[in-house]
């Protein structure tokens, strides 16, 4: 019974993240939506790991790897955005084509 609620919440988070990535024009907002997507994936991994085989921790361990990747993205992403903002004076995605310089 509780599994369905967690999966529905994960689907909502994933949908909000995808919608935000598609419609956002700001790089910071796109990074935040990417974090939402990664957290929804982590919720699915842990839920299905517990649902199908709770003795093996494959989903939990893979979730830890995804959290590590998200932490690296959260550390490197704002640095890249601030560098682009310093050079281009904008964080809008459509104005930051680096190949036109």
Curated annotation (Swiss-Prot):
Its EC number(s): 7.1.1.-
Keywords for the protein's UniProt record, in alphabetical order: Chloroplast, Membrane, NAD, NADP, Plastid, Plastoquinone, Quinone, Thylakoid, Translocase, Transmembrane, Transmembrane helix, Transport
Catalytic activity: a plastoquinone + NADH + (n+1) H(+)(in) = a plastoquinol + NAD(+) + n H(+)(out); a plastoquinone + NADPH + (n+1) H(+)(in) = a plastoquinol + NADP(+) + n H(+)(out)
Membrane topology of this protein: Multi-pass membrane protein
Chain segments annotated as transmembrane: 2-22, 32-52, 61-81
Quaternary structure annotation from Swiss-Prot or TrEMBL: NDH is composed of at least 16 different subunits, 5 of which are encoded in the nucleus.
Family statement: Belongs to the complex I subunit 4L family.
Name assigned to this protein: NAD(P)H-quinone oxidoreductase subunit 4L, chloroplastic
Organism: Calycanthus floridus var. glaucus (Eastern sweetshrub)
């Amino acid at each position: 019974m509780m599994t369905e609620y967690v999966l529905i919440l994960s689907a909502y988070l994933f949908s909000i993240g995808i919608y935000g990535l598609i419609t956002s024009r700001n790089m910071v907002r796109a990074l935040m939506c990417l974090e939402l997507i990664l957290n929804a994936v982590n919720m699915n991994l842990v839920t299905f790991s517990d649902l199908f085989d709770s003795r093996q921790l494959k989903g939990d361990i893979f979730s830890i790897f995804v959290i590590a990747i998200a932490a690296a993205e959260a550390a490197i992403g704002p640095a890249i955005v601030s560098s682009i903002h310093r050079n281009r004076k904008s964080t809008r995605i459509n104005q930051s084509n680096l190949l036109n310089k």
